[in-house]
Amino acid sequence: MPVSRLKLTFWSVVILCSGLAVAGRPDGGYHLLKKYDLDAAPGGKEYWDYITFDASSRRLYISHNTEVKVVNADTGAVVGSVPDLKRVHGIVVMDDLGRGFISDGGADEVVVFDLKTLKPTGHIKTGGNPDCIIYDPASKHIFTMNGKSNDASVIDPAALTVLATIPIGGRPEYAVPDGHGTIYDNVEDKNEVVAIDSMRNTVKSHWPIAPAEEATAIDLDAQHHRLFIGGRNKLLAIMNVDSGKVVQTFPIGAGVDTNIFEASTGMLFVATREGTLHVYHEISPDNFSVVEAVKTEFGARNMALDPKSHQLFLDTADFAPAAEPSTEQPHPQPTPVSGTFRLLVYGR
């Protein structure tokens, strides 16, 4: 449903821990709470991808071109970084092992680092361009979805070895485990979701996601067996994983990259590059309602959730206008401005 714009009864702006604290909205909707500057990327080229929130340390691990920035989630302070990478995508944090795992797509490897010192301690070769990286609690293995070689690498996080390579049959994107031995993965160029048996390391099902296309973002309501699939054709599809059927769809903004379902509240969040945060609520497994569409900032397509505070973390930067079209670049895009990378905190 459309959301009316209500005038704020007051604005107060204060500098707090180097972040911008913003007055709350009287209508109780999601709004910007704080904004933190995160410094320029090494080498000056701004690029970012996944954000990982670690509840035990209350740290954010933020991919930032050739480094992972580590940020205090409560203060916005940068506490360190994992440097000297090629092109970072995702981060898995395993507190029980004291290790973190980074998918470095530019090096075709996973970089292992110490959670205390943030120093790299190992390198594991994977398939080409490992993008999404997840931990599967059923198998206790790490999986990387490799966008160039169209397969998944299965890693033992204790032994730091590759156990298997799973052919996907297309370009794998974001994936999510159900905790019981199945991983659901978007296959972007095939317009389908595959179900991976994480105990046998095989693909067991292929499901079309129509009318959604070019899916990137994905998350799961594990209790009710519903997948939330974000398509780059500006469509959110909700799928029953027992049948592989799409049961509901919603229009969304351009450039979706993250879906998050919060099981404790039944809230579903969808972040898009155009600068819209879509918020939905689960009435029943086959009936989601639109709560609101929140204007964020252009480029804020990646997101993490703090389940304690229910706050959302997004990141973006300023953008320079796109260049004029040319033969080499017929569809130029706006480019991020070096030194403007920042963290946005949203909540109610």
Feature map (PLM): residue ranges:
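Predominantly soluble domains enriched in secretory-pathway, periplasmic, or organellar proteins
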Residues: 19-348
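Bacterial N-terminal signal peptides
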Residues: 9-19
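Bacterial N-terminal signal peptides that target proteins for export
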Residues: 1-11
